[in-house]
Amino acid sequence: MESSVPLGNSVRTGAACGRIMAVPSKAAQGDARARWKLLGQALRKERLDDSLQKVSVRRFNSFRLFSVVEMKEIKREADCQTWFQYTCVFCPQYSLCLRHNSGISNVADILTSFDNTGNVCVWPSEEVMAYYCLKHKDIFRGLAVCELGGGMTCLAGLMVAISADVKEVLLTDGNEKAIKNVSDIIRRPQNEEMFKDRLVSSRVLRWDNETDVSQLEGHFDIVICADCLFLDQYRACLVDAIKRLLKPSGKAMVFAPPRGNTLSQFCNLAEAAGFSIQRHENYDEHISNFHSKLKEKEAAVYDENLHYPFLLVLCKTR
């Protein structure tokens, strides 16, 4: 009898993969039980046990590159969404009003919507990419820019939109709820003033949807993307989407942690698709220094394999 393991919308079997499924170690079984308990507490909206935080990817949630202040003058949304003022600590002239979850997500949405990871929080890689784009805003001057998989805030793409003398910024995600939220953020009066005469828009874009990709083929000078490499079933689609969205002379900037071998697998697929890749581990002095301090002083919560994003720069070679 074949063993089967569900992965998103697909099922992988031991025979189909050409390998015997290994029996999980006791440590792995213990982590799995802890994750189920963590999920149960989250669904019951209980305070999470400190002992369970070690199995949560979100136990580390920020490189502290942005100050985040709740905008209490704006009425809290009924679905646990709250407006916050995001201001870059190192470039305080750049600030935006963002809305995202401040409580437990709706369970029905989690179970029925397409890839809800971007609706959970602003992930560290997105935060780092937003900061990096602000520090290097001149590279976007006069260009058409697209953010892929930006979640419910598209923080990095929005920071490009308010800081760079950019021609166009398109903010995308595969989740409809995420893009509805991004659209509301764009239309927020305080934010609209920051965009000036720049073209800033949002739309649902699934990398595996031919119509979504073909409508924008060859349109962008730069594609940016953060922490979108971990889903096995969409990794090849992401590579294909990036290649097709870019102009012949275009490039992509991808920020992502290793997460086992997922980063390497993405690089292999990208090279096979005709990209040259520059891989940077130390691309910003402040982030590198903070990374070193985290490894030394916060090892209980900080795992560089899960949390420290590398920078990949992809350029077309064919």
Curated annotation (Swiss-Prot):
Listed CDD domains: AdoMet_MTases
Enzyme class: transferase
Enzyme Commission code: 2.1.1.60
Presence of keyword Translocase: no
Record's subcellular location: Cytoplasm; Nucleus
GO molecular function annotation: calmodulin-lysine N-methyltransferase activity
Superkingdom in the source lineage: Eukaryota
Reactions it catalyzes: [calmodulin]-L-lysine + S-adenosyl-L-methionine = [calmodulin]-N(6)-methyl-L-lysine + S-adenosyl-L-homocysteine + H(+)
Classification via Pfam families: Methyltransf_16 (PF10294)
UniProt GO cellular component terms: cytoplasm; nucleus
Keywords: Cytoplasm, Methyltransferase, Nucleus, S-adenosyl-L-methionine, Transferase
InterPro entries, alphabetized: CaM-Lys-N-MeTrfase, Methyltransf_16, SAM-dependent_MTases_sf
GO terms (BP aspect): methylation
Family indicated by similarity: Belongs to the class I-like SAM-binding methyltransferase superfamily. CLNMT methyltransferase family.
Assembly: Monomer.
Function: Catalyzes the trimethylation of 'Lys-116' in calmodulin.
Protein name: Calmodulin-lysine N-methyltransferase
Recorded name of the encoding gene: camkmt
